[in-house]
UniProtKB/Swiss-Prot annotation:
Effect ascribed to mutating residue 343 to A: In transgene rescue experiments with doxa-1 loss-of-function mutant, results in reduced capacity of the transgene to revert increased survival in excess iodide, an oxidative stressor
Quaternary structure note: Interacts with bli-3 and tsp-15. Interacts with csnk-1.
Similarity comment text for this entry: Belongs to the DUOXA family.
Region span, Disordered: 324-376
Gene ablation phenotype (knockout): RNAi-mediated knockdown results in a blistered cuticle phenotype and resistance to iodide toxicity.
UniProtKB keywords: Glycoprotein, Membrane, Transmembrane, Transmembrane helix
Protein topology in the membrane: Multi-pass membrane protein
Protein name in UniProt: Dual oxidase maturation factor 1
Low complexity biased stretches: 351-370
Subcellular location: Membrane
Organism: Caenorhabditis elegans
GO biological process, one term: protein transport
First-listed, main subcellular location of the protein, grouped into a coarse class: membrane
Length: 397
C-alpha cells in the first residue's frame, strides 16, 4: 500500500558538485558588459567619429569595471603551495593538496584542493576525497573578525591547513601582526578606490556635457588609483610566509605577493594619467573636437571659435572698422524701432499714422544703409587702385 508510505521515494541522492561561480562578480560585470554589447549592436549606425567614439566609450567602461572589480574581488595579494598534510583528526591519512590564499581589501579567501592520497588509513575506510575542494571566505574589515573566524572554523571542523592560515591572520602580537597590516592597508586603499570611482563618474558626466573639462576628472581618477597602489604597497606586510611540509617532507613556505588587482589598478592609473595629460595638452592647443550629448554650441568644440582678421594696410582696416561701425548703428536703430513698435502694440492704441511713420523710417534706414554700403564699396575700390598704382609710380621715377 504505497499511499501509506509503503513505497517511499529514495532519500540517498548523490552529492552534486557545487559550481565555482561568483554570482556577485557576474552581476557587477553585467552592469558594464551589457552597455558595451548594446553599443556594439548600434555601432554600424554611427556615421561620424566612429573610431574616437568607440575608443572613448570602451575606455570609460573598462576603467569603471576595473575599479568595481578591485573593490569586490579578493585578489590584491595571493599565493599558493603544494603541501603534504593531514586532512582530519584521529586519522593517519596524509594527502597532497594545494592550498591557496587570496587577500582582498576587506576579506580573505582560503582554498584547499585535493591532489592525491599519499597514505591510507585502514581504521576509517571509504573516504573518497577525489572531489575535495574547500573555498572559504573570511572578513578582515573588523578588529576581531579574524579571531571570530578562527573560532567558527574550529567549531565547524575546517581542515588543518586552513586553520593554520587563519591562525596567522588572527594573531596581533609583536611581529605576528599580518592580519592587522592587511586590514589597515585594505581600509585606506578601499577609500582611495571609492574616491577614484567618484572621479570616474564625474568624468563620464563631463564627457557628455562639458568635454573640454573631462580631462581634469580623468587625471584625478588616475592619480587616485596610483595613490591607492602606493598606500597598499606601504601599509601591507613586506612578505607573508606560512610554513608547511612539502611533498618530499621538506619545509615549504606559502608566500603572498601582489596579485592581479594591484597591477590592474596600477595600469589603470597610468592609463588615466596619460589620457588626462594628453587631452589637456590637446585642449590647450585646440587640436581635437568633441561633440556634446546635447550638441550645445558652447561646448561643441574644445576651444572658442576665432578668426584672424585680414591685413591689407591701415586704409583697408579703417574701411572695415568704419563699415562695422555703420552696421552696428543701423542694427541699434532697427532695435529701437522694433522696441517702439512692441510698446505701441502692447498699449492697444497703435494708430495708422505711427505704422506709416515706422514703415517710412525703416525704408529710409534701408535706403541709407544701401547707399552707405555702395559708398564704402566704391571707397574700397579706390583705395585698392591707389595701392596698385603706387608701386608703378615709384618704379617709373
Amino acid at each position: 500500500m504505497w499511499w501509506f508510505g509503503g513505497n517511499p521515494s529514495p532519500s540517498d541522492y548523490p552529492n552534486a558538485a557545487i559550481p565555482n561561480f561568483n554570482m556577485h562578480a557576474f552581476v557587477i560585470f553585467s552592469v558594464f558588459l551589457i552597455p558595451l554589447i548594446a553599443y556594439i549592436l548600434i555601432l554600424p549606425g554611427v556615421r561620424r567619429k566612429r573610431v574616437v567614439t568607440t575608443v572613448t566609450y570602451v575606455l570609460m567602461l573598462a576603467v569603471g569595471g576595473a575599479l568595481i572589480a578591485s573593490l569586490i574581488y579578493p585578489c590584491w595579494a595571493s599565493g599558493s603551495q603544494m603541501i603534504y598534510t593531514q586532512f582530519r583528526g584521529h586519522s593517519n591519512e596524509r594527502i597532497l593538496a594545494k592550498i591557496g590564499v587570496e587577500i582582498g581589501l576587506q576579506k580573505v579567501n582560503v582554498t584547499l584542493k585535493f591532489e592525491r592520497l599519499l597514505s591510507s588509513n585502514d581504521v576509517l575506510p571509504g573516504s573518497d576525497m577525489t572531489e575535495l575542494y574547500y573555498n572559504e571566505g573570511f572578513d578582515i574589515s573588523g578588529i576581531s573578525s579574524m579571531a571570530e573566524a578562527l573560532h567558527h572554523g574550529l567549531e565547524n571542523g575546517l581542515p588543518y591547513p586552513m586553520l593554520s592560515v587563519l591562525e596567522y591572520f588572527s594573531l596581533n602580537q609583536d611581529s605576528f601582526d599580518w592580519g592587522r597590516h592587511y586590514r589597515v592597508a585594505g581600509h585606506y586603499t578601499h577609500a582611495a578606490i571609492w574616491f577614484a570611482f567618484a572621479c570616474w563618474c564625474l568624468s563620464v558626466v563631463l564627457m557628455l556635457f562639458l568635454p573640454h573639462n573631462a580631462y581634469k576628472s580623468i587625471l584625478a581618477t588616475g592619480i587616485s588609483c596610483l595613490i591607492a597602489c602606493l598606500v597598499y604597497l606601504l601599509l601591507s606586510p613586506c612578505e607573508l610566509r606560512i610554513a608547511f611540509t612539502g611533498e618530499n617532507f621538506e619545509r615549504v613556505d606559502l608566500t603572498a605577493t601582489f596579485s592581479f588587482c594591484f597591477y590592474l589598478i596600477f595600469a589603470i592609473g597610468i592609463l588615466c594619467v596619460l589620457c588626462g595629460l594628453g587631452l589637456g595638452i590637446c585642449e590647450h592647443w585646440r587640436i581635437y573636437t568633441l561633440s556634446t550629448f546635447l550638441d550645445a554650441s558652447l561646448d561643441e568644440h574644445v576651444g572658442p571659435k576665432w578668426k584672424k582678421l585680414p591685413t591689407g594696410g591701415p586704409a583697408l582696416q579703417g574701411v572695415q572698422i568704419g563699415a562695422y561701425g555703420t552696421n552696428t548703428t543701423n542694427s541699434s536703430r532697427d532695435k529701437n524701432d522694433i522696441s517702439s513698435d512692441k510698446t505701441a502694440g502692447s498699449s492697444g492704441f497703435q494708430s495708422r499714422t505711427s505704422t506709416c511713420q515706422s514703415s517710412a523710417s525703416s525704408a529710409s534706414l534701408r535706403s541709407q544703409s544701401s547707399i552707405e554700403t555702395v559708398h564704402d564699396e566704391a571707397e574700397l575700390e579706390r583705395t585698392h587702385v591707389h595701392f596698385l598704382q603706387e608701386p608703378c609710380s615709384s618704379s617709373s621715377t
